[in-house]
């Protein structure tokens, strides 16, 4: 009991600060939990599976009896235990650090002991050197190994060593193009190009005349077109307005209708004063 109280008290002082409960309050809480049957032994308080039942029982007791002292103490203890668990500090390690016994935890091995600054720098330099060498080895291009044959000779000249056939073959120009029989129209292309190269620059080369077949689509350029047909004579213009309108028979009583004088239609032509009224002459 005393060992568990010391461990919990030190944890509360570490994670709760000034609000940490006293050892007397922690002991009273543990005695109550054992009395209620929530803990078989004080060390069961370290297991997270017992935290929820303890919280529920103390909350119900505070609601029924109105005593919240144990619930407040349990809240502080629970916060310290959760913080210690988050930092991966187990109960065995806490007991070993406090020298309370109850658990055997081996001290940290030599690999966990912190090395001096000089040794860390040396180790870091060695690691950097190794990584640099490995990176350079990966980035270096792989050498292509040429297969070496023993007792072989060149199939061109038959010599075993010192043959330059491969170099001569590589530097030789390609063979000239030979026209095939499938395209007879391309047979003389090479000769025409050679002839064209012989002519000096600026000189006009003779143009090949187009080959005409038997079909002609239109007249030749030299042929003259027939003259256009003469236009028809211009139509005669309409005669001017007649000066007088002939009388039309069939008036009232068989009398002919009067005719209008030109001055009625053109009053300004004669310069008379009666511009708006024309002279009407009746015929008997």
Swiss-Prot record:
Residues 225-236 have a biased composition (Pro residues). The record marks 155-156, 166-167, 179-180, 231-232 as: Cleavage. The keyword Ribonucleoprotein does not apply. Pfam families: Retro_M. Gene3D superfamilies: Immunodeficiency lentiviruses, gag gene matrix protein p17. The keyword Translocase does not apply. Residues 249-265 have a biased composition (Low complexity). A motif (PPXY motif) lies at residues 174-177. One of its GO terms (biological process) is viral budding via host ESCRT complex. GO terms for cellular component: virion component. One of its GO terms (molecular function) is structural constituent of virion. Gag polyprotein: Specific enzymatic cleavages in vivo yield mature proteins. Late-budding domains (L domains) are short sequence motifs essential for viral particle budding. They recruit proteins of the host ESCRT machinery (Endosomal Sorting Complex Required for Transport) or ESCRT-associated proteins. Gag contains one L domain: a PPXY motif which potentially interacts with the WW domain 3 of NEDD4 E3 ubiquitin ligase (Potential). This is Gag-yes polyprotein.
């Amino acid at each position: 009991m005393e060992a568990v109280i010391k461990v919990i008290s030190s944890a509360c002082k570490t994670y709760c600060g000034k609000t940490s409960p006293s050892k007397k309050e922690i002991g009273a809480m543990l005695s109550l939990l054992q009395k209620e049957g929530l803990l078989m032994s004080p060390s069961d308080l370290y297991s997270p599976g017992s935290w929820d039942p303890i919280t529920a029982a103390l909350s119900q007791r505070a609601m029924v009896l109105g005593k919240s002292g144990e619930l407040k103490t349990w809240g502080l203890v629970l916060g310290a235990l959760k913080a210690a668990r988050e930092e991966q500090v187990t109960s065995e390690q806490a007991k070993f650090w406090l020298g309370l016994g109850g658990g055997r935890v081996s001290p940290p091995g030599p690999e966990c002991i912190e090395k001096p600054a000089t040794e860390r720098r040396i180790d870091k330099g060695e690691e950097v050197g190794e990584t640099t060498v490995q990176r350079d080895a990966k980035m270096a291009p792989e050498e292509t190994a040429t297969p070496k044959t023993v007792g072989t000779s060149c199939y061109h000249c038959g010599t075993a060593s010192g043959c330059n056939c491969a170099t001569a073959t590589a530097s030789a120009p390609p063979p000239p193009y030979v026209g095939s029989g499938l395209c007879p129209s391309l047979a003389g292309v090479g000769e025409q190009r050679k002839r064209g190269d012989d002519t000096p620059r600026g000189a006009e080369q003779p143009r090949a005349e187009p080959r005409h077949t038997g079909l002609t689509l239109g007249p030749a350029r030299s042929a003259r077109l027939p003259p256009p047909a003469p236009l028809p004579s211009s139509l005669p213009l309409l005669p001017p307005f007649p000066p007088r309108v002939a009388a039309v028979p069939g008036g009232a009583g068989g009398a002919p209708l009067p005719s209008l004088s030109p001055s009625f239609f053109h009053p300004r032509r004669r310069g008379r004063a009666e511009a708006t009224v024309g002279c009407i002459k009746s015929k008997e």
